[in-house]
Structures are given as C-alpha cells and as structure tokens.
Curated annotation (Swiss-Prot):
Belongs to the NfuA family. [4Fe-4S] cluster binds at C149, C152. It comes from Shewanella sediminis (strain HAW-EB3). Keywords: 4Fe-4S, Iron, Iron-sulfur, Metal-binding. Involved in iron-sulfur cluster biogenesis. Binds a 4Fe-4S cluster, can transfer this cluster to apoproteins, and thereby intervenes in the maturation of Fe/S proteins. Could also act as a scaffold/chaperone for damaged Fe/S proteins. It comes from the Bacteria. Homodimer. This is Fe/S biogenesis protein NfuA. Its cofactor is [4Fe-4S] cluster.
Amino acid sequence: MITISDAAQAHFVTLLADQPEGTHIRVFVISPGTATAECGVSYCPPDAVEADDMEFEFNGFNAMVDEKSAPFLEEASIDFVTDQLGSQLTLKAPNAKMRKVASDAPLSERIDYVIQSEINPQLASHGGNIMLVEVTEEGTAILQFGGGCNGCSMVDVTLKDGIETQLLEKFPGELTGVKDVTEHQHGDHSYQ
C-alpha cells in the first residue's frame, strides 16, 4: 500500500527518538476522493490508535492509516530527498483525489480516472479542467472544457495534440477519438 524509502524510514526513526515511547506515524488524507484532497504525515501516540486503523511495519516504527484514507493511499510513496537547497520529506499519493479504478471497469470510468488523475492536474496550471460528458457507441470521448480552458485560443491544440494523444495511447482499440462540446466564450477567465 505505502512505500517508504530507506532514507525516509531512517528520518522517521530519528524524529520518533524524541517522542514518547510507543509513538509511531500516521499517514492520512484530508477530504479523500475530492479535488481538494491533501495528504499528510503526523505523529501517532499510542492513545491515538483507533480500532479500525491499518498498521504497517517498517524498520523501527509502524505507520497507521485510518480506514477512510486507506483506499486513497494505494500506491502512495514517501521519500526523504536531499539536494542543494536542503532536505525534505515528499509524499506522493496518486490516488488521493480519486480512487484507482479496476482495469476491467467500464471504459468511461477508466477514462474519467485518467482525466482526474493525470490530465486535469496538468490543465490546473492554467486554471482549467475538462470533464467527460460521455463515451459514444463509436468510442468517441465527449469532453467539456472548464475554467481557464473555456475560450482559450490554444484549446484545439490542447485537445488534439495533448488530451487526445494521451487518451488514445492509454486506451488503444477501445477509444477512437475525442470531441469538444464546450460552447467556448473568451473572457477574463480564459487562459489566452
């Protein structure tokens, strides 16, 4: 479920040495499954362990995960990175905002997962997003742009060279193309 690098494990052992006996760490997600999901790590003293917590053993400490956060921490990783600017813990949880879908889930669910977990984070840098409206019987993903993408002069390039290319690579033989059904209106909200 959660991978903690050797460097991060050593860092946690050092931090926990200054805490009361029996203190471990807690890895959690606030607002899991939403666009505002945030992950965190905190100390977990013995009296803060809940009956439904999942417990994972590491070198010199355990990591507690609450039942609600667990599915959103699938494939999560924690590392301790040192560079010229110093050192920091990094926590990556690719499924925090949306639960990973099974490989045999309906095509629309798998496309929506890729949109939410991979494409929308890229578009967010311009204040934009896309939403899957439907997948036609012919295998065309019908998309609607929102935020800064609505009315952006580069939307056609983003759609064909970015989104369509990415989705066709992910779903060969299932998806035949993408189509934008947004009624674009250029305004102050538009990126370009």
